[in-house]
Amino acid sequence: MNTSNRRMGLFYVITGATCWGIGGTVAKKLFQEYQIDVNWLVTTRLLTAGMLLLMLQLFRKDRSQVIEVWKHKASAGQLLIFGLLGMLAVQYTYMASIQHGNAAVATLLQYLSPVIVIIYTLLRKQTVLTKQDIITVVLALVGCFFLLTNGSMSQLSVPAAAVVWGVLSGFAAAFYTLYAVGLLNKFDSLVVVGWAMIIGGFALGFIHPPWQLDFQRLTAEAYAYILFVILFGTMIAFWFFIKSLESLSPKETSLLGSLEPLSAVVTTVVWLKAPFGSFQWIGAICIIGITLILALHKEPSMESEKSILKIRNHANRDI
């Protein structure tokens, strides 16, 4: 893996996580000011973003992959699993945790995913635990905690259902990151993410069809927010996150995903004029620290390269 590929991988995951966080803040404004249903927004953004990604693929040389992925039972089955247990599960479990509790707890529990990814790769003997792994995981958990709670434990007092959904969200995010690798070995990231979004959106559409909304009450501003959530908060965010796995290991990608709550909090402070506490500054420094550690990390050694290849080979066999 050369330095330029690694830099591009860092660019993709940082941009993707940032867009996801900003998109979450914009979505929050839609929920609060326009009373848009969560399930409607998730269904609509998945279906629309998925179709746009596949349309992009049709303008590329390897456009045949859009149909080719469905011609083989193995890849078709993998894509269905990824769309339902990966793409849809990440969205639904996270939203369910918010519904039963609050966004702080939901996000904190979802960011157990880097720990789950590292434990999985250790158990499969696909990597070794390093001092950097321990430092970055601690920084991710501490950083997210301070960012989302400002050091107040009162926000962590939620019903058991919120905790269960939050933990499931963490496992779903880990599965999403690990499972994608096998598909990326065979198909372009546009194809993988595009079809996964359509599968997830179609399944959720049975609960809340995208046409069930009072469109007349929406203003031009609301439509602009919805468009932003679809293009940047969904399409770019998920595509770039998955594409980064072509150049980075799953544990690096999942750790850098902690930029999502940082970008969400910063956007809330700057745009929605929310206060930013002293403990949140500590959290921000922790998250920035992760980015610097991984960005300044030298290009992987041959042993690291082999561990990444092992993950991909195991993923191919397991799925």
Curated annotation (Swiss-Prot):
Superkingdom field: Bacteria
Membrane-crossing residue ranges in chain numbering: 8-28, 36-56, 79-99, 103-123, 134-154, 163-183, 187-207, 222-242, 255-275, 276-296
InterPro entries documented for this protein: AA-Vitamin_Transporters, EamA_dom
Record keywords: Cell membrane, Membrane, Repeat, Transmembrane, Transmembrane helix, Transport
Membrane topology, record value: Multi-pass membrane protein
Primary localization class, coarse: membrane
Location in or out of the cell: Cell membrane
GO cellular component, one term: plasma membrane
Pfam family, any one: EamA
SUPFAM superfamilies xrefs: Multidrug resistance efflux transporter EmrE
Stretches assigned to the EamA domain: 18-149, 171-296
Intrachain S-S bonds: none
Family, as annotated: Belongs to the EamA transporter family.
The protein's name in its UniProt record: Uncharacterized transporter YdeD
Source lineage: Bacteria, Bacillati, Bacillota, Bacilli, Bacillales
